[in-house]
Amino acid sequence: MNISKKALLIGLIIISCIVIIFFNYSNNIKSEKNHDKIFVESNDQANLKEISFFNLDQEEFFLSDFNGKVLLVNLWATWCAPCRVEMPSLDRLEDILGDESFQVIAIAVEKTDISKIAEFYQEEGIENLKIFHDKSTKSGLYAKAAGLPFTLLINKEGKEVGRKNGPWEWDSEEVLEIINELKEIN
């Protein structure tokens, strides 16, 4: 191989490395910007109304049972450390804003017995959230999750308006403002 071919090959390798570094750097910047958002806007309008889950008495509920309410639907598990950390803020959010027009629905998605979830609520002093469970973990919501905790914000018409992967302080001023704005929309 002559010198000009070697120089060309080395040049292509250097340019390829620069391109790879640039794309990795720009993707990191984008993910940091998204991480700073509370909710990532979603255009996913899959039918959420038929998503089912159970309460402590093993009664089946569907998201459509809550039509007319703004919902903050949180998927979590007792074994998930970030989920356990954010549960008190979800409980406070339900205490602050929970009424006929808004509800936090925290659905434990795990194969454990629902009594273990009730024990967790008692140990952590969770008083305002109702106990909901999806033991099958086959919920359509679970399929949307990139991991736990996973939270959807749903408007009164039952349409997803935003989602959050990962934990958050759900009783923060920013969240209260967003939910209050949605509650006011007819």
Q: Each predicted region: which residue ranges?
A:
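Short extracytoplasmic
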Residues: 38-69
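Thiol/disulfide oxidoreductase modules built on the thioredoxin-like
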Residues: 119-127, 133-181
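N-terminal targeting signals for export/organelle localization
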Residues: 1-50, 186
